[in-house]
Amino acid sequence: MDGEEQQPPHEANVEPVVPSEASEPVPRVLSGDPQNLSDVDAFNLLLEMKLKRRRQRPNLPRTVTQLVAEDGSRVYVVGTAHFSDDSKRDVVKTIREVQPDVVVVELCQYRVSMLKMDESTLLREAQELSLEKLQQAVRQNGLMSGLMQMLLLKVSAHITEQLGMAPGGEFREAFKEASKVPFCKFHLGDRPIPVTFKRAIAALSFWQKVRLAWGLCFLSDPISKDDVERCKQKDLLEQMMAEMIGEFPDLHRTIVSERDVYLTYMLRQAARRLELPRASDAEPRKCVPSVVVGVVGMGHVPGIEKNWSTDLNIQEIMTVPPPSVSGRVSRLAVKAAFFGLLGYSLYWMGRRTASLVLSLPAAQYCLQRVTEARHK
């Protein structure tokens, strides 16, 4: 899901200059008819315009944290509340001020659909937790992870219902604004949901799973829009989750801390120097530091800052540990309870339906006629 892609270079006479508002060399087209620009000339012209719009000292919201890579590339991390109009405005302002080369958002390929849905559709989808969604989650993640995903979706649905606001508005704004910036790419920076939930489930004992599920099932505290804005320094959804999983350190590690590492890794991958197009292979390579905007929940910002300068190994947080004996037993117990409850419900509904049908006057009349016919 990249924005505009860089065109292949052709011949052009370029010369590096430094405009007043840019901190890196800008290839300026020296001559030529604007009507007959080559691809390289057009690229250089658009790049020059972009870098001129990029402010040397951008006026950024207070929710933005600036990080600098070893090669001089800059990363502006916008800490957001997932249900906040202010966060959407912060994202728009930051992207317009810094004119980034890459925008990275806290989404994975399993949640990318929210970027293309309109607000009304998202609001309806977020409030509806159907059996079909449960079946899809179980097929995708397995029984335990699927049930956990649905319980967490219930938390999001609760906030959605309380506020009448669809989640992920800041990501949709980032997607729209990135498409307006020349040569800006759009990256998904979050760890895939199935990996996160499977690792989270594997980290809990059977009774911890039961206690967590109980807390999620009976979530009903009212929330106002003022609560969201007051929680701007700590995302509301993540704060509610932190309160519920606070007694489960392993769950916090898998859902929050490990994703901090993954998000940091993806931001560092995006923050690489950009190679400018060359008129010919004989011309020396010219690179400039890149500018990246990251859009993440406010609760992830401290972890990203902490991990920014450390060596990261994401392989170990991408593996799903094999189920333990207790895990297999708990899964069997949950399956048995689920199918037992389903069977009892069908049995009860069948008896209830039969009683209702037999109590109807028409059914009573038919039974009476059958009885009379037998006695004759």
Curated annotation (Swiss-Prot):
The modification Phosphothreonine is found at residue 65. Residues 14-27 have a biased composition (Low complexity). Pfam families: TraB_PrgY_gumN. One of its GO terms (cellular component) is mitochondrial outer membrane. Keywords: Acetylation, Phosphoprotein. Transmembrane segments: none annotated. The modification N-acetylmethionine is found at residue 1. One of its GO terms (biological process) is mitochondrial fusion. Residues 1-34 are annotated as: Disordered. The keyword Phosphoprotein applies. GO terms for molecular function: mitochondrion-mitochondrion outer membrane tether activity. This is TraB domain-containing protein. The gene is TRABD.
